[in-house]
């Protein structure tokens, strides 16, 4: 028999969190509570390749551009964030086609199939991202994943900071986590 806490996933009570998934259909918003899935819906129709969140912001890597939305603007309440049924207003940032996005120290990072890594200051609101200024951080192998200041690329793992992208080792990095953990074609490694 479900407990009261488990039933709350279907209401607007506390204890729920909205997570975002990148899919071929678009960005899917899912309300979860512990191990239960509640309400879900498509937040943005596009070919989403990666999604990242930081504070109220949701960034999406697509085949056309990097898109950003402000979850707090969706319901007019700066103290809360949007749920799956709230419409998010995604705006293009001008990066171009991207394979991965991530946030690090108040900045949005993006990478593409050509290995270009760019950094953009996190906006005060998503609407200002339409005029975002991207700074090229470095060039690596095809970018596959970004988390924090780490980039997983076809030719290894890179640390990104103000001085650029520095090779941190390994080859054929498939995914990265700021722990720092790296998934490669030959196994899982801790940097």
What are these regions (language model features)?
Residues 1-191:
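Acidic, polar-rich N-terminal leader regions of halophilic archaeal proteins
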């Amino acid at each position: 028999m479900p407990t009261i806490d488990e039933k709350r996933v279907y209401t607007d009570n506390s204890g729920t969190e909205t997570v975002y998934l990148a899919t071929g259909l678009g960005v899917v918003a899912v309300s979860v509570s512990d191990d239960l899935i509640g309400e879900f819906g498509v937040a943005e129709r596009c070919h989403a390749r990666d999604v990242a969140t930081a504070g109220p912001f949701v960034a999406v890597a697509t085949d056309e551009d990097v898109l950003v939305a402000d979850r707090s603007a969706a319901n007019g309440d700066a103290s809360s964030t949007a749920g799956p049924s709230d419409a998010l207003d995604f705006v293009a940032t001008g990066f171009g086609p991207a394979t991965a996005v991530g946030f690090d120290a108040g900045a949005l990072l993006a990478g593409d199939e050509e290995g270009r890594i760019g950094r953009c200051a996190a906006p005060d609101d998503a609407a200002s991202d339409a005029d975002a200024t991207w700074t090229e951080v470095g060039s690596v192998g095809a970018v596959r994943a970004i988390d924090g200041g780490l980039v997983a690329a076809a030719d290894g793992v890179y640390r990104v900071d103000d001085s650029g992208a520095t090779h941190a080792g390994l080859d054929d990095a498939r995914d990265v986590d700021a722990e720092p953990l790296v998934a490669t074609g030959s196994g899982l490694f801790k940097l």
